[in-house]
Structure formats: structure tokens, C-alpha cells
Amino acid sequence: MKVLVVVALLVTLISYSSSEGIDDLEADELLSLMANEQTRKECIPKHHECTSNKHGCCRGNFFKYKCQCTTVVTQDGEQTERCFCGTPPHHKAAELVVGFGKKIFG
């Protein structure tokens, strides 16, 4: 019973301190947070071309997408590099395992 009371008290204190922390944000901090959100929205989505900006891919569910490049040969015989944002195979495997674990354990 004492442990339950102590845990409830700790949860109350933590939630109170975190709510005060949110209230203490100043307008400048809010503007910088909004600017960060804007730059996050300007990232390159999955399956879109990232040839000119190889580090600008968005985040997926668990990992950031990687810019994956291939060499394309045109009909003229010229080789060009084309890149797209995608999920690497090892990240796909990790997401599959996590998704399977969530289904099993709830």
C-alpha cells in the first residue's frame, strides 16, 4: 500500500513538473519549434527523387529514409545517376519484427 502511494505521488510530481515546463516556453522558443516543424515538412518523402539533396529524406515510422542511388543508361548510351528516398532492407526487417512483436504482445 505504501509503495502504491509513493508511486502515485511520483507520477503526480512528474506530471506537474512537465506541465510547468510547457507553460514556461517563451514566444521565441515556440517560433523556433514552429520553424523546426516547417523544415521537417520540407523533407523529401518516400519514393521521391533525392538526386540533388541526398541527405534530405524524411523520417519513416522508425527510421529516417535513406537516399538510394542507381545508375540509369539512356537510349543514347549515357549513364546518369538517379536517386530516390527509400527504406533499406535491414530497416524493413527491423520494422517487420517490431510490427510482429506489437501484434503478439499487444
Swiss-Prot record:
Keywords from the UniProt entry: Disulfide bond, Knottin, Secreted, Signal, Toxin
Listed GO CC annotations: extracellular region
Intrachain S-S bonds: 43-58, 50-67, 57-85, 69-83
Tissue: Expressed by the venom gland.
Subcellular location field: Secreted
Pfam families linked: Toxin_35 (PF10530)
Signal peptide start and end residues: 1-19
InterPro entries per the UniProt record, alphabetical: Spider_toxin_CSTX_knottin (IPR019553), Spider_toxin_CSTX_Knottin_CS (IPR011142)
Propeptide cleavage-removed residue intervals: 20-40
Keyword Transcription regulation (UniProt): no
GO molecular function: toxin activity
Similarity annotation: Belongs to the neurotoxin 19 (CSTX) family. 04 (U1-Lctx) subfamily.
UniProt note: domains: The presence of a 'disulfide through disulfide knot' structurally defines this protein as a knottin.
Protein name, as recorded: U1-lycotoxin-Ls1b
Organism the protein comes from: Lycosa singoriensis
